[in-house]
């Protein structure tokens, strides 16, 4: 695996009046939903700078690869911009990962936020720079919805405060799949994207870490195939613990005879033998709770809790 950093550092927390950059490194955002979300950022007291390719369209991509990559680089290069927020996911981040200037990001570390297809960028950036990034609800995808959950919006408060976060059953019911306690760096994201990193220079490193997974609109046999690939790659047993998050609409459609999602998850997660909890509202769900990738975390299946340290620093950058 290329450039896996052992020393992590947190970006600086935001203050009211700060400028944030909005980009679309994958697919183009819905214009109306994006406009609604930009108003939300203004309500938080933030100034907004839009990427040049944000509203471009090239098939299912938000512009050509070099345009989307240039937006990513420009937002990190611009010292006025204190955070880089992804408008939406979709498809396309894997196409630009090989061109990322990681030295630029190390020189200009700042908040990076998104999920779904953005998982590929989280893995690439974190493992090649050590920067803690945020797997969180996106602007067009989530914040721009008419019925956005208050807790989804509240996730953005993590960017302003250096506060430890404890996930309990007050947020959602949690099921113990494998008993035990575990602690380590929090890594993971969208299962489809994590699987797509295998065999690339950006292959997910789960050794001694807490792995969280989520997905949407994948049938049980597809989840089976991806978990089997992670299993054969040693990614499940390498992990210290596993957090199974939301798998929205992952039900049989094409196949009359099918295993259930629950059966597939239990086959792989239980056999991995690592402490595991299921039911976290992280991913393509409502509410959608943000978590910092690369932050230290601890899980306790008996207490049904996951404690995650702050993903930002209110002072100088912390390691």
Curated annotation (Swiss-Prot):
Source organism per UniProt: Bacillus subtilis (strain 168)
Location(s) in or outside the cell: Cytoplasm
Annotated GO CC locations: cytosol
Signal peptide as annotated in the record: none
Source superkingdom: Bacteria
Chief place of localization: cytoplasm
EC number, UniProt record: 3.4.16.-
Protein name: Probable murein peptide carboxypeptidase
Function (record text): May be involved in the degradation of peptidoglycan by catalyzing the cleavage of the terminal D-alanine residue from cytoplasmic murein peptides.
Induction line: Repressed by AbrB, a transcription factor that negatively controls biofilm formation.
